[in-house]
């Protein structure tokens, strides 16, 4: 009986284990490719908004200064005066990296920025604030969750210092995503409680897994709308 069960489920277990090992030990450093970085910078997709590795790759390129342009649906409308078009046409010494989607409001931007804080510290960024963000009621949880992922969560948990900003962000996160991963840790932050050593270990493990997963699968996520010409 056990042998038959192993023959059925054993290969699935081994395959799952191999996938986990591949993700955990996949190198998180990648070589720079300016053309691909321009593609990801101009793709203005939900994947480019959420995914870490392509953002970090572009923002750390020593041969081109990418500047984050944060907003919502403004960046989707490409025309002759779009910041990407102007930067390319007039050979400006920078390229915009667009982080915005229709429906992505301030809380999405806050958690998205957690992924790239070391890369943008003491550097420039452009932030376009939409009037639609200022409403009497919070926006729909489904809209928030569309642009939120576990890597943003662990980046936030790893960056937070237990201050009032982290507490407020944790409260809003629980409201928008009541079933968020590592909910117990987020609840502690929302109450202003200090995290234990076990909590920190859990954050580190999940953060490493998410970072490796982003490095592995992120290279396949930006392959669609190529709005830059190779030159």
Protein language model regions, located:
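Hydrophobic membrane-insertion alpha-helices, especially the h-region
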Residues: 4-27
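Membrane/wall-proximal cationic-aromatic binding patches
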Residues: 30-94, 112
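Glycine-centered flexibility motif
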Residues: 71, 103, 216-218
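Secreted/periplasmic serine-hydrolase-like ester/acetyl group-modifying domain
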Residues: 155-231
């Amino acid at each position: 009986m056990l042998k038959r069960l192993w023959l059925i489920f054993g290969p699935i277990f081994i395959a799952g284990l191999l996938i986990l090992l591949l993700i955990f030990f996949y190198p998180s450093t990648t070589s720079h490719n300016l053309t691909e970085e321009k593609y990801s910078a101009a793709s203005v997709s939900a994947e480019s908004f959420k995914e870490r590795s392509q953002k970090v790759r572009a923002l750390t390129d020593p041969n081109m200064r990418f500047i984050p342009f944060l907003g919502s649906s403004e960046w989707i409308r490409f025309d002759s005066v779009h910041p990407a078009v102007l930067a390319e046409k007039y050979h400006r010494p920078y390229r915009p990296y667009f982080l915005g989607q229709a429906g992505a409001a301030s809380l999405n931007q806050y958690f998205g920025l957690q992924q790239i804080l070391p890369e943008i510290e003491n550097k420039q960024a452009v932030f376009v604030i939409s009037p639609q963000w200022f409403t009497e009621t919070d926006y729909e949880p489904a809209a928030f969750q569309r642009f939120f992922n576990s890597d943003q969560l662990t980046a936030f948990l790893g960056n937070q210092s237990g201050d009032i900003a982290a507490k407020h962000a944790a409260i809003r996160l629980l409201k928008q995503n009541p079933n968020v991963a590592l909910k117990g840790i987020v609840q502690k932050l929302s109450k202003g409680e200090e995290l234990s050593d076990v909590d920190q270990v859990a954050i580190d493990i999940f953060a490493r897994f998410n970072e490796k997963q982003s490095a592995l699968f992120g290279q396949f996520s930006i392959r669609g709308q190529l709005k830059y010409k190779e030159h």
